[in-house]
C-alpha cells in the first residue's frame, strides 16, 4: 500500500481527471489526500475520540437500517412470503400433538447448527480484528469431548445436559472402546457447520473485488488497494510476504477450482487474497464458493479436528503434564494446577446433577473464562470502531464530491 509521496507518484491508474480544478488532475495530490483521509479515519476509535466514535457509530447504524429497509421494501413480495411461511411454522410449533417430538428435534438441531455457523462467520469476517472462535469455542469443545470420551469409554453422553454439559452415561463402555473415528463422528456436525460459516465469511472480499472490477470505480478498501498495487509491482517484488501473496494469486488465477480448494484446505493467513483475486478476475461465484466450502468445511476442518483430538487424547495429555514437571525449578509448581484441573474435569464427568456436590473452580478455567470475555469485549469494540470509521468515510467522500463540483 502506498504510504509516501514516491509510491503515490507511481500509482497513476484509475485517478480522476477533473478539468475544472487543477489539483484534482495531479495523481500524487489525490494519493496524498486518500492517505490523509485514511489516517484520519483510523484515529476515530473509542479510546481516542469516544464521543465522536459513538456518534458516528449510531449514525452508521441508522443509515444501514434505512438502506436495509429500502431493500426489503423493494423485495416486499419475498418478505411477505417469508413472513407467511414463518406464521405457518409458528402455528405448527405451538399446536400440541404427536409431531411435537419431531419439532423439538428439528429445533434443537437447527439452533445448534446456526450457533456454529454464526461463530464461523464471526471468525472469518472479523470486521477488522477477527474473533478467533475456533480457539475460543470449537477447539475447547472438541477437546472436552475427547477427554470425556477417553474417561467414559463412550460418546453416548446423556442429552440433556449434552451439549451444554458433558457427563458420563450410566453404562460406560469397555476400556479401549474409543477410537479416533468415534470422536471425529461425534463432533462432525458442529465442526462442519463452523467450517461452512468461515466459508460464508470469505464472501465479502470476493463481492467487493468483483463489484469494483465490473463497475470500474476505484474502491478505497485498503486490502483491495494493496492487491492492485501488488499486481502493478509484481515484477519487482523482493520481500517474502509479497512473493507469498503473488504465489497465492497465481495459483488461484491459473489453476482455478483446484487452486482455490488447495488454498481453502490448508490453514493460512492469505486466503482473503484468494477471495479478492477471484473477485478481481471474475471467477464464477459457484466455482469460488464451492471450492471454499469443500476446502474449509470438509478438508480443513478434518485436519483441525484430528490435530485437537490427537493433542488431547488421554496418553498425550498425561505425557504433556508429566513433561511440565521436568522443567527445572518451576516445573512442579506449574504441573500442580494442570493435574488439579484434569482431576476436577474427571470428577465433573462422573458428577450427577442431583448430587449437590459443590464444584471448586480451578484457576486455569477461571483464566480461560476471563480471556474469552476480554476477546469478545475487544471484538465488540472493533465493531463499533469499524462502523464509526465507515461513517467517517461517507463524510469524507461527500466532502470530496462537493469540492470537485466547485
Curated annotation (Swiss-Prot):
Stretches the record annotates as VTT domain: 173-316
Transmembrane parts of this sequence: 43-63, 77-97, 111-131, 251-271, 274-294, 307-327, 364-384
GO biological process: lipoprotein transport
Assigned keywords, A-Z: Cell membrane, Endoplasmic reticulum, Lipid transport, Membrane, Transmembrane, Transmembrane helix, Transport, Vacuole
GO MF annotation list: phospholipid scramblase activity
Membrane topology: Multi-pass membrane protein
This protein's record includes keyword Endoplasmic reticulum: yes
Extracellular side: 64-76, 132-250, 295-306, 385-406
Parts of the chain on the Cytoplasmic side: 1-42, 98-110, 272-273, 328-363
Cellular component GO terms, alphabetical: endoplasmic reticulum; endoplasmic reticulum membrane; endoplasmic reticulum-Golgi intermediate compartment membrane; plasma membrane; vacuolar membrane
The keyword Transport is assigned to this record: yes
Catalytic activity, as annotated: a 1,2-diacyl-sn-glycero-3-phospho-L-serine(in) = a 1,2-diacyl-sn-glycero-3-phospho-L-serine(out); cholesterol(in) = cholesterol(out); a 1,2-diacyl-sn-glycero-3-phosphocholine(in) = a 1,2-diacyl-sn-glycero-3-phosphocholine(out); a 1,2-diacyl-sn-glycero-3-phosphoethanolamine(in) = a 1,2-diacyl-sn-glycero-3-phosphoethanolamine(out)
Location of the protein in the cell: Endoplasmic reticulum-Golgi intermediate compartment membrane; Cell membrane; Vacuole membrane; Endoplasmic reticulum membrane
Annotated segments matching region Disordered: 1-22
Written domain comment of the UniProt record: The VTT domain was previously called the SNARE-assoc domain. As there is no evidence that this domain associates with SNARE proteins, it was renamed as VMP1, TMEM41, and TVP38 (VTT) domain.
Known function: Phospholipid scramblase involved in lipid homeostasis and membrane dynamics processes. Has phospholipid scramblase activity toward cholesterol and phosphatidylserine, as well as phosphatidylethanolamine and phosphatidylcholine. Required for autophagosome formation: participates in early stages of autophagosome biogenesis at the endoplasmic reticulum (ER) membrane by reequilibrating the leaflets of the ER as lipids are extracted by atg2 (atg2a or atg2b) to mediate autophagosome assembly.
Family to which this protein belongs: Belongs to the VMP1 family.
Name the UniProt record assigns to this protein: Vacuole membrane protein 1
UniProt gene name: vmp1
